[in-house]
Amino acid sequence: MSFYRGTASHPWHDLHPGNDAPNFVSCVIEIPRGSKVKYELDKDTGLCFVDRILYSSVVYPHNYGFVPKTLCEDGDPLDVLVLMQEPVVPMCFLRAKPIGVMQMLDQGERDDKLIAVHADDPEYKGFTDISQLPPHRLAEIKRFFEDYKKNEHKEVVVDDFLGAEEAKKVVKDSLNMYQEHYVPRKLRNVYE
C-alpha cells in the first residue's frame, strides 16, 4: 500500500492482491449482499460511485467486488463474488479463497466472475471447490446474473461454472495481465 502524506490510497492499484495468491486473495467489496445498488469503482479516483439502481426486483446474492492489481480483457479488475454469511460495507477489503469461476458473456464480451468464499467465515471456509456447493446456490448465482440486466434490455449469458484449479489460473492470468499493463518490466512479478 502507499500512504503518502496528503494522497489517498487507490484500492485497485495500491492494495496487495494477497501474499498467498492465487490460493487466497484480497478482495475489495463494492456491493454488499442484498443490495439493489450497483456501486462501482471509479478507476481514475479510486472512489466508489453509484453506477445505477438495478431495474428489476433482484438483489445481489452475495458480496461482490474485485481483486486488487488484476486486469481482465474488459479493461477492469477481476470481478469476484464472495460467499459469506453477512453483507459488508462497500469498499472494505477481506481475504477470500477462490473455489471456482463462472464463465459469462455480457453483451457479447467475456466477463468471467471469480467465485470465492470468505477465508474466515466458519460456514464457508471449509469449501475448496465450487462442486461442493449445493446445486441451489449455483442456480441462484446463475439466475441473478442472467436476470439482473434484462429490464435494461441487455443480454447476459452464463456459460458454465469451472472449479478451483481453473479459478486459480484465472487469478494468475489476471495478475500477470495487470503486471504487463501497469508495472515497468524490471519491477514485474510473475505469477505461476
Curated annotation (Swiss-Prot):
Q: Does the keyword Hydrolase apply?
A: yes
Q: Where in the cell is it found?
A: Mitochondrion
Q: What is its EC number?
A: 3.6.1.1
**What are the binding positions for Mg(2+) 1 in this chain?**
D74, D79, D111
EC top class named in words: hydrolase
Which coenzyme or cofactor does it need?
Answer: Mg(2+)
Q: Which residues bind Mg(2+) 2?
A: D79
Keyword annotations from UniProtKB, A to Z: Hydrolase, Magnesium, Metal-binding, Mitochondrion
Q: What is its main location?
A: mitochondrion
Gene3D superfamilies for this protein: Inorganic pyrophosphatase (3.90.80.10)
**Which terms under GO biological process does the entry name?**
phosphate-containing compound metabolic process
Superkingdom of the organism of origin: Eukaryota
Enumerate the SUPFAM superfamilies for this protein.
Answer: Inorganic pyrophosphatase
Assembly and partners are described as:
Monomer.
Identification of the protein by name: Soluble inorganic pyrophosphatase 2
Q: Which gene encodes it?
A: ppa2
